[in-house]
C-alpha cells in the first residue's frame, strides 16, 4: 500500500485544524464529495471558531443544507465553536480527551483530526477500514474500537502515521463492499477473504 501511495492524503478539503475538525464532523453519514461541495463557500468566510460564531447557526445551515442531518450538525458545530472559544483559546486541542469534549466529536472524528492536523499515529475506523480489517482478517473485531486497538498492536511503528489512510483508501477504491476488485488488489496474496477467488472475472 505504501508503494502505491507513499504520502496518502484524506479527501476532505480544509485549510487549518479548525476547518478540518468542522469538515470531519460534517462528514458523518455523508460523502466527502458532498461535504467538500458544502464547505467550499463556508470556508471562504469561516476559518476560526470565532468566525463560526459570528456567522451563526442559521447562516451555517444555509451553507450545509445539502448534507444529511444538517440541522443537528449545525447545532453541534456552533456549540463546539463556543467551547473552543471559551475553554481552549479558540484553538483545536491536540489530545483525544479534550477533542471528545466538543459537541459532535466522537473518537473517530478526534482520531482523524489528531492524525491529519497534528500528525499523530492514530487510527480512525470508518466503515471502509472496519470492512477491510474484518474481511482480510488483519484485525477482526465486532466494534470499531476493537478493530482500532488490534490495528494499533499489529501495525509496525514506521507505518503507523499513514496506516489509517492507506486502509481507508484501499477500502474505498479496491476492497469495496459489494464488488471488491480482488484481481487488482496489491495485497491479494496476503488477504484471507474466502470469497475473493469467486470474484476473479
Question: What is the predicted role of each segment?
Answer:
Residues 2-201:
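Catalytic cores of DNA base-excision repair glycosylases
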Amino acid at each position: 500500500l505504501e508503494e502505491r501511495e507513499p504520502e496518502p492524503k484524506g479527501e476532505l478539503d480544509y485549510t487549518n485544524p479548525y476547518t478540518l475538525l468542522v469538515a470531519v464532523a460534517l462528514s458523518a453519514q455523508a460523502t466527502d464529495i458532498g461535504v467538500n461541495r458544502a464547505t467550499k463557500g463556508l470556508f471562504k468566510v469561516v476559518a476560526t471558531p470565532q468566525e463560526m460564531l459570528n456567522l451563526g447557526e442559521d447562516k451555517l445551515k444555509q451553507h450545509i443544507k445539502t448534507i444529511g442531518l444538517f440541522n443537528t450538525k449545525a447545532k453541534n458545530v456552533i456549540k463546539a465553536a463556543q467551547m473552543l472559544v471559551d475553554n481552549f483559546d479558540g484553538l483545536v486541542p491536540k489530545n483525544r480527551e479534550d477533542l471528545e469534549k466538543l459537541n459532535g466529536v466522537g473518537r473517530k472524528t478526534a482520531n482523524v483530526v489528531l492524525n491529519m492536523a497534528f500528525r499523530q499515529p492514530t487510527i480512525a475506523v470508518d466503515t471502509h477500514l472496519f470492512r477491510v480489517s474484518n474481511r482480510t482478517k488483519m484485525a477482526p473485531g465486532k466494534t470499531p474500537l476493537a478493530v482500532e486497538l488490534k490495528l494499533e498492536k499489529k501495525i509496525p511503528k514506521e507505518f503507523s502515521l499513514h496506516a489509517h489512510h492507506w486502509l481507508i483508501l484501499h477500502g474505498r477504491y479496491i476492497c469495496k463492499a459489494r464488488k471488491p476488485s480482488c484481481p487488482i488488489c496489491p495485497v491479494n496474496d496476503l488477504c484471507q477473504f474466502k470469497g475473493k477467488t469467486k470474484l476473479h472475472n
